[in-house]
Every structure is written in C-alpha cells, then in structure tokens.
C-alpha cells in the first residue's frame, strides 16, 4: 500500500483555539476512494489541519508516497516550506499542490519550487485521483486533465478538467 498524507491548514485567528475539519481536502480524498485502483493501492495515513512547527509535523509523516496540499492565501508559504522539507527528507514522495491559491498560469512556478511535482487546477477531485491512478500505472499522465507537471523545472500543462457532478462526490463526514 502506498502512503498518502493530506493537509489543509486552518486559518489562524489570534487568541482563539478555533479549528475546523479540512472539508475541501476531505472531499478530494472521499472522491478518490470511489474510483478504480485507489482503495486497493493507497491508504490515507493522516489529514493535517492545524499549523504546528514544521519539525513537529514532519515527525508525523512517515514514509510518504504522496503528499497532497490544499493551498489558500493563509497557508501558501507554510505549505511550500512543508513541501520542500518533505521532498528533502523523502525525495521519492510525489508532492501535489491544489486549492484556491494554486496559480492557473504556472509558467515559471516549478523553477522556483523544484520540490513540487504537480499542481492541480480548478476542481481537484478528478485531477488528484487521476494522478494517483497514474502513479500505479492505471492512467497515462497526459490523460489526467487539469494538471501542471514539473518537467525538470519546465511546466507542462494538460487540458482543462471537466466539472464533476456533486452527486458523484461522497461526503467526507460520512466515510
């Protein structure tokens, strides 16, 4: 089984202990588990949602094959540092960044972030799942829509992803 770690770090509100369930990244995983090849080949080891010192978080990430990061304005810099440190420690780990703050025009992105392997654009459910299927040889990479690929620092982008039907996405609360 391949180890998957996901993170959608919370917005920090000074003086509060408010945390939330990382719904968006939970939906991405919930959708993935409905698709061929995922449950037989991958296990979700953890979903992180609380920003803590990266050294502490790294102790909880053991032998990752895939790290998926949902990025927003408030966690972009943290996610990029986490991605860099995970790639440094586990060079074989595939780093995937998606979410609302992922650049749609990603030319030059990988030159300054060589530790990121893939970006997902628009709705990440099918793109993330397609990448997981690619990693186990069940799908050609260029057939995975909505992805930018780090090709030795150059950006290769596949076609746009199609919108998915909300009825096809299970609730992460009910898994």
Where in this protein do the model-derived segments appear?
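Glycine-rich beta-alpha loop elements in corrinoid/cobalamin-binding modules
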Residues: 2, 31-34, 41-162, 166
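Nucleotide-activated donor-dependent transferases that construct or modify glycoconjugates
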Residues: 2-16, 66
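Generic beta-structure capping elements
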Residues: 7-9, 152, 160-161, 172-174
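Glycine- and acidic-residue-enriched helix-capping/strand-helix junction motifs
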Residues: 13-25
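Short aromatic-enriched loop/helix-cap "lid" or pocket-rim segments at secondary-structure transitions
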Residues: 17-19, 159-161, 169
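Radical SAM [4Fe-4S] cluster-binding motif and immediate context
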Residues: 24, 167-175
